[in-house]
Amino acid sequence: MEKEIKYLPIINRSDSCKVKVSDICYITRDDRKLLFDTEYGLKTTYGKMNTVERYLGPEFVRCMSGCIVNLSKVRETKNMIVYFENGKELKLGRTGYVRLKQRFNAYLRKMPPWDDKKDDTNRNEDTDNDGH
C-alpha cells in the first residue's frame, strides 16, 4: 500500500473535484470508469481500481475485482446485500459477499467490547476459586 491520502482527485469532462476518502461508501467499475459512491452522491472518473486501491486505508476491502467497500460505512450485511449507514445498498454476488462478510466480521471484532484482550483475564478475576 502506498501512502494513505485524505482526498482523491476526480477529474472528468464535466467537472473536477476532490473527494474525501472517508466519505466514500464504495467504489465500483464500469468498463474503464470508476464510480465513487460517496456521502454526497456519485462521482465518476477514468482510472484503474489497482491505482486507487493503493492509496486507501485498511478499512477499504476489495471484495471483487470491480468493487471496493469502505467497512467504516457499512451498517449491516444480510442476504447478499451490504447496507450502509446512510441508507444506500449494494448487492453483491456470492463470492464477493462471502469475502466482504468475512472481512466485515473481522472489522467488527476489533471494536469494543470484542477488541478488549483483557476481557478473558477480567472474566477469570470476576470468578472466585469455585468457578462462580
What are these regions (language model features)?
Residues 1, 7, 20, 108, ...:
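N-terminal regulatory/sensing modules of transcriptional regulators
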Residues 96-99:
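Compact, glycine-rich, soluble single-domain proteins
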Residues 1-85, 89-91, 132:
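Conserved binding/recognition cores within well-folded domains
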Residues 101-103:
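Short, surface-exposed, low-complexity cationic segments
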Residues 61-65, 105-112:
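Short, surface-exposed secondary-structure junctions/capping segments
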